[in-house]
Each structure stands twice: as structure tokens, then as C-alpha cells.
């Protein structure tokens, strides 16, 4: 079902609260999971990201290389961009010599694999289920992509925009999400708005808890 996964804001909040952001690894994991959802990236696209693929300025975007080696630029929300900015600065990834390095690596400094990303997500799903008593079903990285697609449809984004956002070859593939919600489909067909209003992200050094902020995601 295309509606599986993080079906509401509360679930997303619970998941994003699980990484321990008092540790570098927890901050990396939050950045990774938040980017995976925010960009609706395929898991391999996330693994392939290099530092130069992230542009963090007044209009933050991530450059994704998808199926058939077709690339697309996906806009990022301000909260996601701020988390990424802090992750990049903290790890000194913002120097010219490192621009072609992998954005996310495993503990050995090697490129992340799809199974590695799945392992990280599964760990936090398990942690969330322990905290909230089996609150989540089995969620894979691809479920985050499904969830983002559904949320774009429900927000009334037009289908051409969603197709390009997801990197679909055909609008018919994108319509699968819209058909799951007829009213959302009508709105998606009518609207041409392509931007989302998002809150500003506090510095995690100034606000190590972040829970109040995460409620706004």
C-alpha cells in the first residue's frame, strides 16, 4: 500500500526523536533519516551522495543521480538544510578538498550500502516501538519515499511537480499515489504551487533536545 509508513506528523516526530543527538553518530543518523524522507530519495541515491551534491543556501537543494543515470535537483526544507549544514560543518566536510567525498559513511569511513541504511533505520524503528509499544510497522527506507510522495499529494502539489520530485519516468507511476486519495488527487491536479513553508531549524548546540522543533516537522 502506498500509504504505509510514516502516515502522520506524530509518527514522523517520534521517529526523528530516536537518534541520540548528543553524539556525533546520532547527529549523522538524524541527518540521514531526515534527508531520506525530505528528499524522497531512493536508498541507492542516498548512498551515492557526495558533499558537492548538497547546496545549502537561500534555496537549498540536493542533486540526486537516479535510475538510468538521470539526475534531478530536489528542494529541501529549511529544517533539513539546517541539520545538514550543521552535520557538514561539524565533520569539516565543507572544505574544497572534500567536496567529492561521500556525504555519509559507515564507522570505517567507507561508502554506505543499502543494507547499512536499512540497518540504521531498523534500529530506530525498533527503538521507537520500544518507547511507544509497537507503534510502527516494519518500515524500510523505501517506505519513507512512499510517505513523502503521499504527503506531497495530500498537500496539493501538482502531479508534474511530484513526478519530477520523485524522478519518475512516467506520470502514470506518480498517479498511483494520487489514486489512493481522490480528493488529494483533485487538488494535486488543480494546484501549481511547488513550494512548502517550513520552520527554521535551531542550532542543536543551542538546543540539544530539539523535541520542540521536531514537533513542527
Where does each model-flagged region fall?
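Conserved catalytic core of the tyrosine transesterase superfamily
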Residues: 1-4, 8-217
Amino acid at each position: 500500500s502506498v500509504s504505509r509508513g510514516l502516515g502522520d506528523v506524530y509518527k514522523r516526530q517520534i521517529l526523528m526523536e530516536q537518534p541520540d543527538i548528543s553524539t556525533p553518530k546520532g547527529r549523522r543518523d538524524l541527518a540521514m533519516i531526515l534527508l531520506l524522507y525530505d528528499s524522497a530519495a531512493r536508498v541507492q541515491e542516498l548512498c551515492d551522495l557526495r558533499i558537492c551534491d548538497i547546496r545549502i543556501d537561500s534555496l537549498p537543494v540536493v542533486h540526486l543521480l537516479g535510475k538510468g543515470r538521470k539526475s534531478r535537483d530536489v528542494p529541501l526544507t529549511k529544517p533539513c538544510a539546517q541539520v545538514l549544514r550543521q552535520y557538514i560543518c561539524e565533520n569539516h566536510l565543507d572544505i574544497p578538498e572534500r567536496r567529492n567525498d561521500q556525504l555519509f559513511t559507515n564507522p570505517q569511513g567507507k561508502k554506505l550500502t543499502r543494507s547499512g541504511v536499512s540497518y540504521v533505520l531498523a534500529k530506530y524503528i525498533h527503538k521507537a516501538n520500544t518507547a511507544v509499544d509497537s507503534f510502527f510497522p516494519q518500515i524500510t527506507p523505501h517506505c519513507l519515499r512512499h510517505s513523502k510522495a503521499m504527503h506531497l499529494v495530500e498537500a496539493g502539489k501538482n502531479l508534474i511537480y511530484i513526478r519530477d520530485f520523485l524522478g519518475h519516468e512516467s506520470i502514470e507511476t506518480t498517479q498511483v499515489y494520487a489514486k489512493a486519495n481522490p480528493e488529494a488527487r483533485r487538488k494535486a491536479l488543480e494546484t501549481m504551487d511547488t513550494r512548502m513553508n517550513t520552520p527554521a531549524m535551531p542550532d542543536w548546540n543551542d538546543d540539544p533536545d530539539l523535541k520542540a522543533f521536531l514537533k513542527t516537522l
